Amino acid sequence: MAEDRIKSKLRRPASIESTMSSRTKPRHKPSPMSILMPHLMVGESFRKYRPHGLRNIRMNGHLDWNQLRKSFEKQSTFHGISHAATADGKWRWFWYTAFTICLLALLIQIFFLISKYRQYGKTVDLDLKFENAPFPSITICNLNPYKKSAIQSNPNTKAMMEAYSRRIGSGDKTEGIAAALSATGGLHAKVRRAKRKAKGKPRLRDRRYHQAFAQCLCDIEQLTGDRKGSCFAAFKGKIEIDTNNTAGFMNLHTSRCLCQLDTVSKALWPCFPYSSWKEKLCSECVDNTGHCPMRFYKGNELYENIKEQVDLCLCHKEYNHCVSTRDDGIILEISPNDELNDLDIGKKIASQLSAQQEKQAEVTTTEAPTVTQALGFEELTDDIAITSQAQENLMFAVGEMSEKAKESMSYELDELVLKCSFNQKDCQMDRDFTLHYDNTFGNCYTFNYNRTAEVASHRAGANYGLRVLLYANVSEYLPTTEAVGFRITVHDKHIVPFPDAFGYSAPTGFMSSFGVRMKQFIRLEPPYGHCRHGGEDAATFVYTGFQYSVEACHRSCAQKVIVEACGCADPMYPVAEMFGNNTKPCQAVNMDQRECLRNTTLWLGELYSKGKEAIIPDCYCHQPCQETNYEVTYSSARWPSGSAKVMECLPGDFLCLEKYRKNAAMVQIFYEELNYETMQESPAYTLTSVLADLGGLTGLWIGASVVSLLEIVTLIVFATQAYVRKRKGSISAQSHHSVPVHRASRVSLNTLHKSSTTQSVKLSVMDIRSIKSIHSNHSSKSKQSILIEDLPPAIQEQSDDEEETTESSRTNGSCRYLAPGEDLPCLCKYHPDGSIRIMKALCPVHGYMVRRNYDYSVSNSEEEDAEDEVHREPEPFYSAPYEHRKK
């Protein structure tokens, strides 16, 4: 390579100039000294030669940092440095100061740039796509999870319902101060009765007015559903109706009423629904009548005097007076078959007291305290709280059954769905619906469950979606079911439907419309986000056959923690096989298991509220990376209208239609628009943006680019190489003693004299690898230049260490020492057949022929030798026959 050649121009000696003249014969035979002198002069000149540039910065045995700096300044593309290279004095300092300040500003901005990138911000791209969206899956449930007839046929579930009935029957109906005093035990009937007997007051059974339960008919306003006036009590098959209020049409509904029984007139009036009566503390009750005016205790008297001055009474704001409560708390039960004229109040009260005592004895003997505590009714007084606890107890009792037994206690598909159409076509019930059992709502049925079939709505609007006629069958409703209607869940077909969390209620007697809009979410993975791929493959995921969702993850983790802490599973969640075949649901009457479950659930709730759920292994529930949600809009209208045919009911048959108004509902789910939204997260600041901003900043402050940075890298590499060479050279100089060059020159002269008679020149120097060219200018007798490349380096003594030093010296371009008695190689160029192509004038073997003007091809230019060297293989060093040129 041209950069690896060592070029040196030397002044030719007079003897060489005379011998190298073109086509002239020498007057005498050249002496050996004339042949050796160029080599000696090249060796001396080579020591003085040092190429310029960043690669050769070692001068006089040390690193010349000043030369390095100057070379870098002249070649640098940094704006400030390049100006400083040509400036002097204070302007040089000015440019360096400006460059330093700009460099500091650049570093500060690079720091903020990296900090911004490390925040991993993201943006949300909202895109509205106008194309047919896939229709969602619809899961339909009855608000009543199990049929009452099926619950009563099972001993465990029947016991749960009986416990609830006993607890809800003993609930407190008092209000205000009466409730507070009753809770503290201050109003015991026995104490009050004892005090009244001591004062000689008459017995309560001899008074005129009594409280009584009776069946009644109430007139209900059709438009508002409000009751109009008092109700009419029924006894012995007759109904007492006010004849003055029969002019208009009466919409009568049966109800259970609390009435005032007048033993003198033998009448039940007034009657109001029992729920509308309130218990108060009356201060001016008349003992012999049982009548109390609307004057109540205000709380000004001392607690010790309350028992003697007040009475418990039931009041109604529409009646404007109260009826005193019996000391034993018994309220008469009047059936429609009772004859008021022959009614024996004392006998009636005695029979009710005996029945109540038997019931209490049965509760005491059959229900252990631990069972009562396990059921959770012990500290509850509110009816809503008691009902909620009863629903949970029923769930625990059913959870102990097998899957088939659970499904048999709930509704079948044909019992729940009466009619169905989709996109104005009839549904195929067995093919379009599948059973999905939910622990809260029992048997639910999912429409569009097949994941391999694509179901789409081709038009927007209620008529082109799913329309179903659902039947509740109120006669099979449990006492714990607080509302009549259905639970509708709109969800993606790949995830678990959770009707208790994400469902919508549709009441009976209405047409419920659910307008749907689809939204797709595409989230980023770390480090930009925390979405999760394939969470359904986790060891704790209990909803087999469904994809990952956040709610499913939370419930799976809760089930895992409960099983590990309590040894049993929560019946609200599935019991997966991963927990083992021995894992059973917690029992409803096991106090320890129920208490452990409550405490564990509270602990989990605290963790989630504080954001510390990550302490539970595999329970940090991130959002899925791809998710499809549905936004639902609800609206309703009264149904049926009365003018349309519903099942077997003809238009205008209001008595038949009333059955469906109380038990059925029309539900329709449809797309509001044939488009959907996609919300896709994308990095707010990418690596490409960082590089672009970095390039802009470096160009703004110091005018640099990537190529400018490579200049610094090159500077570091060259400086490192020079430093390593210096270290190796200093170590070699300290370890070995070098042989002087002039000694080798004297040995070579003696050898040349001996070999002159045999027409071969032998020098006592080691192999010279290659002498590239010796150029002669035959047209000019002035200065001649000889280009010598790759001169052999001098070596030390023959040893393993010296060989390494010699190899290093060769690569560094120093002269190699030739040992005494060693022949100089032939420098001529040969043809492939072995004949001489170019004869060198300084060849130690054939050079004398050139100098004697033999007619052979001679190299006369540097260009020819250089071109020949580049394009041809090096010739072997051996003596071969040569061909005489024909004249």
Curated annotation (Swiss-Prot):
The chain crosses the membrane at residues 94-114, 699-719. One of its GO terms (biological process) is calcium ion transport. One of its GO terms (cellular component) is plasma membrane. Signal peptide: none annotated. It comes from the Eukaryota. The keyword Transferase does not apply. It holds the Pfam family ASC. InterPro entries: Deg-1 (IPR004726), ENaC (IPR001873), ENaC_CS (IPR020903). Expressed in body wall muscle. Disulfide bonds: none annotated. The keyword Transport applies. Residues 1-93, 720-887 are cytoplasmic. Glycans are attached at N244, N450, N473, N581, N599. Residues 1-33, 794-815, 859-887 are annotated as: Disordered. PROSITE patterns: ASC. Keywords: Developmental protein, Differentiation, Glycoprotein, Ion channel, Ion transport, Membrane, Myogenesis, Sodium, Sodium channel, Sodium transport, Transmembrane, Transmembrane helix, Transport. GO terms for molecular function: ligand-gated sodium channel activity; monoatomic ion channel activity. Residues 115-698 are extracellular. It is found in: Membrane. Ion channel which is permeable to small monovalent cations. Shown not to be H+-ion gated. May be mechanosensitive and is required for growth and muscle development. This is Degenerin-like protein unc-105. It comes from Caenorhabditis elegans.
